[in-house]
Amino acid sequence: GSVIKCGESCLLGKCYTPGCTCSRPICKKN
């Protein structure tokens, strides 16, 4: 089991990590 980390910034409203959604200003698990 790999852990999904969603710490990227999403100022453009898009998250490139699978399973993450934009919760400005960073991506979070959906």
From Swiss-Prot:
GO terms for biological process: defense response to bacterium. It comes from the Eukaryota. PROSITE patterns: CYCLOTIDE (PS51052). There is a cross-link at G1-N30 (Cyclopeptide (Gly-Asn)). Pfam families: Cyclotide. Disulfide bonds join C6-C20, C10-C22, C15-C27. The presence of a 'disulfide through disulfide knot' structurally defines this protein as a knottin. Belongs to the cyclotide family. Moebius subfamily. This is Cliotide T19. It comes from Clitoria ternatea (Butterfly pea).
